[in-house]
A protein has these predicted regions:
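Terminal targeting and flexible regions in eukaryotic proteins, enriched
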Residues: 1-31
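Intrinsically disordered, low-complexity segments used as extracellular stalks/linkers
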Residues: 13-16, 99, 117, 130, ...
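LRR N-terminal entry segment and analogous cap-like coil->beta motifs
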Residues: 23-105, 120
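The feature encodes a structural signal of leucine-rich repeats
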Residues: 46-47, 88-90, 109-113, 132-134, ...
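Leucine-rich repeat
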Residues: 53, 94-97, 106, 115-119, ...
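Conserved hydrophobic beta-strand positions in leucine-rich repeat
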Residues: 59-61, 98-103, 120-125, 142-147, ...
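Conserved "Asn-ladder"/turn position within leucine-rich repeats
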Residues: 64, 82-83, 104-106, 127, ...
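Leucine-rich solenoid repeat scaffolds
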Residues: 248-288
Length: 288
């Protein structure tokens, strides 16, 4: 790909590398991208200087069938779009300015990925792990996590260590329950859970998320809500569309900030008198 990673140029001496500002970790990443690409798919717009990685803020891996380098909103963006059969290089931990990372189709991740201290957004797609990787739970500055994975079945307790998380979006998984440690995510304001057909319940610890404003649970096997949901005093939108929900807890009447409630296509067979009055007060904001 570049003179720094081309095997025909491996005789360049160390002084030459120092003069150009190229470090070994840069070459390691570009070598990986070279091997990762489908033959003939490489885009000539990708810069030939590995040192450009110093400023990289967005990395899309496994998006399509080509590689490109561009600027989006004045941010350095690298897209290596073919799905990978090779593990990420450990050198990825050197991308100190990386704020956005998209992973697709991986079955192995290096421990060094936890060194991405500037990472704010992670998109996790079609990776083959059955448990969410613990190493990703070390991303203490992560603010947004989006998961789309049919293979995923569970989360480790370490999930609660994502202390900066404000938005969590999970779709199409086989997860049956969220970990109790989700209650440690004190900054979270939005949770969206779509088409997780095996999801049966929410942990009581969900009530600890006092900054939560939006909770959407659609197309799951959810049958009840924890009574602690009444602690979500900032909750404005509660979507429970197309679930197996059979009842609503009395504590739902404590949701004074609620502006929108969707309980359409559920199995609600009856609610208590207090819940009925509450729904009446919410009025047109309720979708049945």
């Amino acid at each position: 790909m570049t003179a720094y990673s081309d095997k025909t140029n491996q005789n360049d001496n160390t002084n030459s590398k120092q003069d150009t500002g190229v470090e070994d970790w840069m070459t390691e990443i570009w070598d990986w991208i070279d091997n990762h690409n489908i033959a003939g798919s490489y885009d000539s717009s990708v810069p030939r200087e590995p040192e450009a990685l110093r400023q990289l803020e967005r990395l899309d891996l496994g998006y399509g069938k080509s590689t490109s380098y561009s600027y989006i909103d004045n941010k350095s963006v690298l897209q290596s779009e073919s799905e990978s059969t090779e593990p990420l290089p450990s050198a990825i931990g050197h991308l100190k300015n990386l704020k956005y990372l998209r992973l697709r189709g991986f079955n192995e991740l290096p421990e060094q990925i936890a060194q991405l201290h500037s990472l704010e957004t992670l998109v996790y797609m079609k990776c083959s792990f059955t448990e969410f990787p613990k190493v990703l739970c070390k991303l203490k500055n992560l603010k947004s996590l989006k998961i789309l994975s049919k293979s995923l079945e569970s989360f480790p307790n370490e999930f609660g260590n994502l202390s900066s998380l404000t938005h969590f979006d999970m779709r199409g998984t086989q997860v049956q329950e969220l970990p109790d440690s989700i209650g440690n995510l004190s900054k979270i304001t939005s949770i969206e859970l779509y088409a997780n057909e095996a999801l049966k319940a929410l942990p009581e610890s969900i009530g600890n998320l006092t900054k939560l404003e939006k909770l959407e649970i659609r197309a799951s096997d959810l049958k009840t809500l924890p009574s602690s949901i009444g602690n979500l005093k900032q909750l404005k939108s509660l979507g429970l569309y197309h679930n197996g929900l059979q009842s609503l807890p009395d504590s739902i009447t404590n949701l004074k900030a609620l502006e929108q409630l969707d309980v359409s296509e559920t199995l609600l067979s009856g609610v208590s008198e207090s819940v009925s009055r509450f729904l009446g007060n919410v009025g047109s904001k309720v979708t049945w």
